[in-house]
């Protein structure tokens, strides 16, 4: 997390941190071939296939066919990294847009609503991070559907709470029933 203030969220910041830690652990004796292995690992990370979780594509297809919603990917991270990950996922046909921000804050959600000319109360954010996806939206008066994932980055851990605009789901497919 030390490189996040400089580089934000993303694979490139992770790669730099990995290199810095390797230098530290080796006592500054990291060899060129070891650096090459770490760089290769970082490049592989940037090219991993973006396989959607079970039920995501089916659910997005149902929501798209209903034609009642503007579906937007709103994510944080490094622009090129996130755009490439999105394209590799194969989910582009289901969305109207992708918006990448350096961090998900109340201000960034408000700007998202302004961009699409909607009131905050019309926004439903679906996500797995209570800190980034859910809490800022609830604070603004929007709606949020929290679908926890079995692992979470320590940086994203916060105390979760109940809220009248909060939907707690176990599976992405449940969106078909609640929307």
Show where each model-derived region lies.
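Asp-based, Mg2+/Mn2+-dependent phosphohydrolase catalytic module
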Residues: 33, 57, 61, 78-179
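Glycine-centered short loops/turns at secondary-structure junctions
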Residues: 67-68, 141
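Conserved phosphate-coupling serine/threonine residues in phosphotransfer and NTP-handling enzymes
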Residues: 75
């Amino acid at each position: 997390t030390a490189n996040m203030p400089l580089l934000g969220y993303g694979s490139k910041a992770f790669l730099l941190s990995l290199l810095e830690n390797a230098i530290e652990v080796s006592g500054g004796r990291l060899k060129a071939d070891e650096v090459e292995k770490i760089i290769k690992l970082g490049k592989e990370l940037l090219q991993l296939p973006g396989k959607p979780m079970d039920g995501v594509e089916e659910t997005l297809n149902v929501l798209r066919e209903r034609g009642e919603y503007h579906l937007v990917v709103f994510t944080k991270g490094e622009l090129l990294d996130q755009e490439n990950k999105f394209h590799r996922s194969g989910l582009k046909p289901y969305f109207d847009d992708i918006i990448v921000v350096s961090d998900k804050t109340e201000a960034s959600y408000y700007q998202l609503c302004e961009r699409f000319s909607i009131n905050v109360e019309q926004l439903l954010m679906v996500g797995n991070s209570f800190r980034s996806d859910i809490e800022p939206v609830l604070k603004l008066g929007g709606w949020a559907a929290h679908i926890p994932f079995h692992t979470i980055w320590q940086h994203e851990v916060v105390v979760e709470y109940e809220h009248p605009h909060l939907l707690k789901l176990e599976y992405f497919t449940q969106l078909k029933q609640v929307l």
